[in-house]
Amino acid sequence: MTWTTPAYTELRLGFEITMYIANR
């Protein structure tokens, strides 16, 4: 990944939160 935009950070953060909830 050569593009680091706020949208990408937000997407990655939301994905990690989703995985965290799914693994509970």
From Swiss-Prot:
Required for coenzyme pyrroloquinoline quinone (PQQ) biosynthesis. PQQ is probably formed by cross-linking a specific glutamate to a specific tyrosine residue and excising these residues from the peptide. Belongs to the PqqA family. There is a cross-link at residues 16-20 (Pyrroloquinoline quinone (Glu-Tyr)). It comes from Cupriavidus taiwanensis (strain DSM 17343 / BCRC 17206 / CCUG 44338 / CIP 107171 / LMG 19424 / R1). It comes from the Bacteria. Pathway: Cofactor biosynthesis; pyrroloquinoline quinone biosynthesis. HAMAP family: PQQ_syn_PqqA. NCBIfam families: PQQ_syn_pqqA. Coiled coil: none annotated. The keyword DNA damage does not apply. This is Coenzyme PQQ synthesis protein A. Keywords: PQQ biosynthesis. Pfam families: PqqA. InterPro entries: PQQ_synth_PqqA (IPR011725). GO terms for biological process: pyrroloquinoline quinone biosynthetic process.
